[in-house]
Amino acid sequence: MDADSDVALDILITNVVCVFRTRCHLNLRKIALEGANVIYKRDVGKVLMKLRKPRITATIWSSGKIICTGATSEEEAKFGARRLARSLQKLGFQVIFTDFKVVNVLAVCNMPFEIRLPEFTKNNRPHASYEPELHPAVCYRIKSLRATLQIFSTGSITVTGPNVKAVATAVEQIYPFVFESRKEILSFTT
């Protein structure tokens, strides 16, 4: 097994966060009274609205800024944001769907081997930091992609990046580094 061989790694996207604007003022009290699946947080000045399909949660401010979380793809996030804008239009607001942007993607990837974290950190010191007393994972930052990876000794990697493409590229870039710090599999023969 070498680092150059093509290994199919499954990258599971667990959360996509997007933001958009409505270009109109939103009456939070009206949304709370007439909307479905809403929680009015008056002390904070926002409304939480949940959609069932796609399964997303939106944080709505009176300024018209809306943050949607919980989608599992960029397409699903946009579809959910549009459904949310449509439901606000049905409540009587003059909503115009603008400034849609995916701001964060969280994904999980499992390597087919375990990783020696102290060795990995020593080999990649400027980008990697490992504090086993504080957190069981190595924090590895790729500034060019604006991605952060949490690398666990079990081979599980949690990736946070600005979009799905950056997350996939980050996993491709990290694979050779974690491969050289992999744990050897011991085989017992009798």
Swiss-Prot record:
Transmembrane regions: none
Lineage: Eukaryota, Metazoa, Chordata, Craniata, Vertebrata
Major location (coarse): cytoplasm
Protein family: Belongs to the TBP family.
CDD domains, per database record: TLF
Key words of the record: Cytoplasm, DNA-binding, Nucleus, Transcription, Transcription regulation
Its biological purpose: Part of a specialized transcription system that mediates the transcription of most ribosomal proteins through the 5'-TCT-3' motif which is a core promoter element at these genes. Seems to also mediate the transcription of NF1. Does not bind the TATA box.
Gene Ontology, cellular component aspect: cytoplasm; male germ cell nucleus; transcription factor TFIIA complex
Gene Ontology terms describing biological process: acrosome assembly; DNA-templated transcription initiation; dTTP biosynthetic process; spermatid nucleus differentiation
Protein name: TATA box-binding protein-like 1
A Pfam cross-reference name: TBP
Organism name: Pongo abelii (Sumatran orangutan)
Family matches, as SUPFAM superfamilies: TATA-box binding protein-like (SSF55945)
DNA-binding is among the record's keywords: yes
Compartments in which it is found: Cytoplasm; Nucleus
Classification via InterPro entries: TBP (IPR000814), TBP-like (IPR015445), TBP_dom_sf (IPR012295)
Gene3D superfamilies per the UniProt record, alphabetical: TATA-Binding Protein
GO molecular function, one term: RNA polymerase II general transcription initiation factor activity
Subunit-level organization: Binds TFIIA and TFIIB.
